[in-house]
Amino acid sequence: MSTARLQQQFIRLWQRFSGLPTETTLQELAEVLCCSRRHVRSLLGSMQQEGWLSWQAEAGRGKRSQLTFLYSGLALQQQRAEELLEQEGIDQLVQLVGDKKAVRQMLLSQLGRSFRQGKHILRVLYYRPLQNLLPGTALRRSETHMVRQIFNGLTRINEENGELEPDLSHHWQAISPLHWRFYLRPAIHFHHGRELEMNDVITSLTRLIPQPLFSHITAVRSPTPYVIDVHLSAPDNWLPWLLGSVHAMILPQEWENQPDFRRHPIGTGPYSVIRNHQSQLKIQAFDNYFGFRALIDEVNIWVLPELSEELVYSGVQLQADDTSKNELESRLEEGCYFLLFDQRSPLTRNPDIRRWLCELITPVALLSHADPFYQRYWSPAYGMLPRWHHNRLRVLETKPEGLTELTLTFYSHHSEFDAISQTLTKLLADQGVNLKIHVVDYTQWYQGDAQSDMWLGSANFYLPLEFSLFATLYELPLLQYCLDEELHQDVELWRNNTLQMADWSQRLVSQNQFHPLFHHWLELYGQHSMRGVRMNTLGWFDFKSAWFTPPET
């Protein structure tokens, strides 16, 4: 029997008798431990060897033996809990302790920096699992950040200034408006040991051609070793940025044959995935990374869905509750929470209904009906970006006739959506409109794969905003169902750098097709001993650039 199992059995005995000396029989103990009398005798012998208890057996049927506890079950439980924390056994820890609030406090006490067996380890607490890390699929904000730590593209977009930097390719050039050439570094290795081949790049990029942003790619070839040619059907000045976006990360060509690649992907990036399940994502520094090796050896993201709302909303948590003064950085997101109105719906296809809804559902009205707690994290949005004021306050007109019920759809594991939908329900009920709530998974939401009148969502844009704002929305299939116009002409202007993003955004907002609600405050909490931490527009930071100062002696 494993030590862990023996510990659990002892704790069960200690709890049954409250740690007090007692006279009992093997049969009674067998019933407590749900095993045979013979096995109980073996267990008691093992527990005596550990020094946890004393068992003085009395011979004869009906005789009661003396059980004396020499060690506290609480102390053993705490010892076991610490062992599970060291092993990142969060699921077993919840089973052992039985109290999720107590587990939460244990986890919080272990957040931040740890130094074990010569390795620097960073522990982060998060409120939901990160189960899809496959580039080119529907990725939420935190998954997007993790993919950037695991994979590389031909180019890299600097998170701080939006400038384009070398990555897998060290140089690139436009041979012609329809022909780009990228020169790749040699001796790049994937996490599973194989060297990067040109066919990996070719298969990674050609798999994206069905997606709107990449549909103008006609061919990807390698004329000579370490050279990649990308041929286009239309000019694209943003192509080098596009090939540095998270969708265009390079995968091993055999990725579809790898077991559970979405959860356990294989890239060439500074971190490789060691473990990814419901309660933990663990990544470790890749020693054969072609760039500067990461300074933090391991990043452990502990998942505890039962986190308090405060912890969910406050952002990335790298410290315990009692060190709230250690806010490293905060910023208003480049993006917003928004409503989209589905053109497939007879109701929201009606411009009068859309206009009335936008008049009713204002950011100020939502905040006034919401719990005061949210005012700390929500800032009224009048455009897609905080600096834009495209949504003018208007007088609420008479409700259109026949409007009695609407359906709102949003994706799961986003508690702020629950709060917003409750507020929307109140606002609409006051006007005699019943709001039906439909919760789907993120992929369904992303694809617009449901019948709905309105869709609640959020978008985080990154630098350069002239690139990411249009790219993020254009690659969202749901948006195509919520516009009364095609974007083909707009994408041509955007690729030629002639689309004015402020004007384009204002058009969507003023036509009541895209309705901004809030900008969210992103906050990063951690220890001041952390260095190299710069919060990006996704609310995270580049793990490979962070490091710890040595503790003071």
Curated annotation (Swiss-Prot):
One MF term in the entry's GO annotations: peptide transmembrane transporter activity
Keyword Transcription regulation listed: yes
Gene3D superfamilies per record: Periplasmic binding protein-like II
Alphabetical keyword list: Activator, DNA-binding, Repressor, Transcription, Transcription regulation
Gene Ontology BP annotations: negative regulation of DNA-templated transcription; peptide transport; positive regulation of DNA-templated transcription
Keyword Transport: no
Name of the protein in question: HTH-type transcriptional regulator SgrR
Record organism: Yersinia enterocolitica serotype O:8 / biotype 1B (strain NCTC 13174 / 8081)
